[in-house]
Amino acid sequence: MDKTKRFSVTDPGKNTPIVFDQIFAEKVGGGLVKNSPFDLYPGMAVSADGDVIKAYKVVEDASESASSIKIAKNSGIVKGDVIAKGKVGVACTAVDTTTSKDFDTVTVKLTVAVSKGDILYQAASASADAAAPVHAPKYLLGEFVEANSGDELVKLVNGANIRKETAPVADEVVALMKSIEKI
């Protein structure tokens, strides 16, 4: 044994952001979340049927005439998803996942400006003035779920104060949930 090396250093890893400031209501016994090809994070919106509403975090400002936007990695975005801000939804026509380890470049025809830090949501269909989430939100996911792990029994939150800086859910989706508030 080398006597000069009596210790080792272990990288602490990535910090897990705090999403819930206060939880005051949960679905008794939890509920099933459907199998997902991407990781699911605490605070993501879930329908009554266990379908997750994807959330896309913008990592760089883009004007309303931009042909692409940069979305943080691990959002689950795929070609064909409809990305929405407010009531405007646009279809994703291509996704470049190879350019950066921090973000995906998503090809869209924007008609609304987006800012760094905005959380966009997965809409049911493209629209210039009537976009709505792909599923009606009922709960927030209360725990991490690994990709491709099958249907999972999880904690589902239906009453909480969540942190606006870290919650992976769009304001438009939160507005549809009467007992969830971003603070």
What are these regions (language model features)?
Residues 1-183:
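Surface-exposed, low-hydrophobicity beta-strand/loop segments enriched in small/polar/acidic residues
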